A protein has these predicted regions:
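Short, structured beta-strand segments at or near domain termini in extracellular proteins/domains
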Residues: 166-177
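Functional-site microenvironments in short loops/helix caps that host divalent-cation chemistry
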Residues: 1-156, 162
Length: 177
């Protein structure tokens, strides 16, 4: 209820659930919103990675699985060292051209949408989709300090989680007025 805006979530049965219809208050971004901002906003062509160019990441492109944590994780980015063993302070690495920080690296992000697999949807265009109305797992987008494989570092990578993880965080969004 920040700034007098209505709550976007309420507790029901020990879980936080979205208010319907979604009000104008602060909320988690939908997977579609996150993907648009991460891959397209301010660009003519979609970005593959949160840094400019191809794999591997350029020096200090973000907080990914690297030499600092190679003794703990199975996959790290070869030859990369961002100087952090875990999460880094927000804004430690350069912002994307549109001004957003840490859309790849540092912590993966919890989305508003519940997780679902959509077979046969690759050739269908959907405008501003949202996931199922209910579920057990939420979509997680973005890489984290534990991400070291080429697929995990792509902005198209999606994961899911039922609860907290040490490399999982969130950002807030709200509808433009």
């Amino acid at each position: 209820q920040k700034e007098g805006r209505p709550e976007a979530y309420r507790e029901a049965g020990g879980r936080m659930v979205a208010v319907s219809p979604m009000p104008t208050g602060y909320r988690l971004p939908t997977e579609a919103e996150w993907s648009y901002v991460a891959r397209m906003l301010g660009r003519q062509d979609p970005s593959r990675y949160p840094w400019t160019g191809s794999y591997p990441p350029t020096s200090l492109a973000g907080n990914f699985a690297d030499a600092q944590i190679a003794d703990t994780l199975a996959h790290v980015v070869p030859g990369y060292d961002d100087k952090y063993r875990g999460s880094a302070p927000v804004g430690r690495f350069a912002a994307q051209p549109d001004g957003f920080y840490d859309l790849g690296g540092n912590v993966a992000e919890w989305m508003h949408d519940y997780y679902a697999v959509y077979p046969g949807m690759a050739d269908r265009l959907v405008s501003d989709p949202s996931g199922p109305d209910s579920g057990d797992h939420h979509v997680v987008r973005g890489s984290s300090w534990r991400s070291g494989s080429i697929s995990e570092l792509r902005l198209s990578y999606r994961d899911y989680s039922r609860g907290p993880r040490p490399d999982l965080g969130f950002r807030i969004a709200r509808y433009a007025e």
